[in-house]
A protein has these predicted regions:
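Gly/serine-rich nucleotide phosphate-binding loop at the start of the catalytic core
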Residues: 1-76, 81-83
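Active-site gating loop/helix substructures
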Residues: 23-40, 75, 79-179
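A short acidic-Thr-Gly-centered motif at the start of a beta-strand
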Residues: 47-58, 115-118, 176-180
Length: 180
C-alpha cells in the first residue's frame, strides 16, 4: 500500500506536504463528527470507559499513542481528567515540557518542614507522531486547538518519518514515551 511505497521511494517535499494535509483533513473531519456526537448526543468514547479502571492520583497515568486525533483528550476531559500534552496555555499553547508538569498543581503541603506538591488527576499524553493541533509558529511548536489542516505537525509514513522524529516536539514525546 501507500506506506510501503513511501518507504521504498522518497517522495518530494511537495508530495509529503500534500500527504500530511490530506491525512490531517481526513482525520480532522472524522474527529469533528465524533466531537459533535460527544457534545450533542452524550456519546461516550471507549477510552472514557477505560479510564474508569485506573486510580489516577498524584502520579497520573501515561498514555502513548501514534494517533494524530484528539479523541483521547476528549475522553479524558469528558471524565474530568486533565491532559498534559507538554504544551502550556489554552489557545496558543507553547511547547514547554518543563513548565507543563507544574501546570497541574492543586496544592502545596508542608509537613515536618518538608514541602510536597499535590497534583490534579491527569493523563500525560505522549504523541511521538504528532497531533492535529500542533503547528509551527515563528519557528516554535504550538498547540492550537482551532486549527486548519494545512500544515500540521504530524509524521506520516515514509522514509523521512525517522528523520522528522528527531525534531521538536516529536523527539521529546518519543524520549518521554521511552522512559514512561
Amino acid at each position: 500500500g501507500l506506506e510501503q511505497a513511501l518507504h521504498n521511494t522518497k517522495p518530494s517535499t511537495t508530495i509529503e506536504k500534500h500527504i500530511r494535509k490530506i491525512t490531517a483533513q481526513y482525520i480532522g473531519n472524522a474527529e469533528a463528527e465524533v466531537l459533535k456526537e460527544i457534545i450533542y448526543n452524550n456519546k461516550q468514547l471507549r477510552f472514557s470507559k477505560y479510564l474508569n479502571h485506573f486510580n489516577i492520583r498524584n502520579n497520573g497515568l501515561f498514555v502513548i499513542t501514534t494517533n494524530y486525533d484528539r479523541l483521547i483528550e476528549y475522553a479524558c476531559e469528558a471524565n474530568g481528567v486533565l491532559v498534559d500534552n507538554l504544551f502550556t496555555g489554552k489557545f496558543l499553547a507553547r511547547f514547554d515540557p518543563e513548565r507543563s508538569k507544574y501546570a497541574f498543581c492543586s496544592n502545596l503541603i508542608t509537613s515536618g518542614g518538608k514541602r510536597k506538591l499535590e497534583y490534579h488527576p491527569k493523563v500525560t499524553l505522549l504523541k511521538p507522531h504528532g497531533c492535529l493541533s500542533w503547528q509551527i509558529i515563528n519557528g516554535k511548536p504550538y498547540s492550537v486547538h482551532q486549527t486548519h489542516f494545512d500544515d500540521n505537525l504530524i509524521i506520516t509514513p515514509g522514509i523521512n518519518k525517522y528523520k522528522e522524529g528527531y525534531n521538536e516536539p516529536f523527539d521529546t514525546h518519543r524520549a518521554k514515551a521511552n522512559t514512561a
